[in-house]
UniProtKB/Swiss-Prot annotation:
Keyword field contains Ion transport: no
Species, as recorded: Ruegeria pomeroyi (strain ATCC 700808 / DSM 15171 / DSS-3) (Silicibacter pomeroyi)
Oligomer status and interactors: Homodimer.
Protein name (record): tRNA (guanine-N(1)-)-methyltransferase
Pfam families tied to this protein: tRNA_m1G_MT
Single Gene Ontology MF annotation: tRNA (guanine(37)-N1)-methyltransferase activity
The gene coding this protein: trmD
Record's subcellular location: Cytoplasm
Amino acid sequence: MTPTPELHGVWQARIITLFPQAFPGVLGESLTGKALQDGLWQLHTTDLRRFGVGKHRNVDDTPAGGGAGMVLRPDVLGAAIEATMQGTSSNWPLIYLSPRGRPMDQALMQSLARCDGVTLLCGRFEGVDERVLEHYGIQEVSLGDFVMTGGEIAAQALIDATVRLLPGVLGNQASTEEESFSSGLLEHPQYTRPAEWMGRPIPEVLMSGHHGKVAEWRRAQSEEITRRRRPDLWQRHQATKDD
């Protein structure tokens, strides 16, 4: 683990990876980076190579039954997980970033933000030995229906989307309440100065100063955009309303 001092009661992300130097990466910039510096959350990395076996610290081996690629070994992963999870509470999920997992969504991020922290396992090669997932009851989570070379980018996406929900990170709680997915709908269009650009004016209602009409317009826009672009979300939203 990286020797970062522990801050009691602060949300933590612990990452098991072959590339600890990839962190914090973009998480060290902008609002998440400032929040990290201010101690609003913490980041720890575990270098999986440290737990490798043999003179060359091997972390993988060939797939049982044959096939292309390499699979991360269960003995290596088990040792890394045990070390990384030391001192964690019962409210601390262990997640493996995997294309076969549950898709990331806002509800997941809101749930993780209410936890004490999260440990993320970043895979490489052909993935991890299935016995590790079974033994530790690891939850699989996916960034989308595509395959990447490793889980590090997906881990950064998950952390970014969760950290911004932590108290004090954004500064304006309304920002998280009004954005896409928070109400089950996609976000309404946004505009700013100048009032007209390339012959395109800002919609009059947004310049009216009438907060009620602005809210109605934004709601209608959110519903229409969701209905057209994400019929799956729209159906879910309609079903929730009917309940």
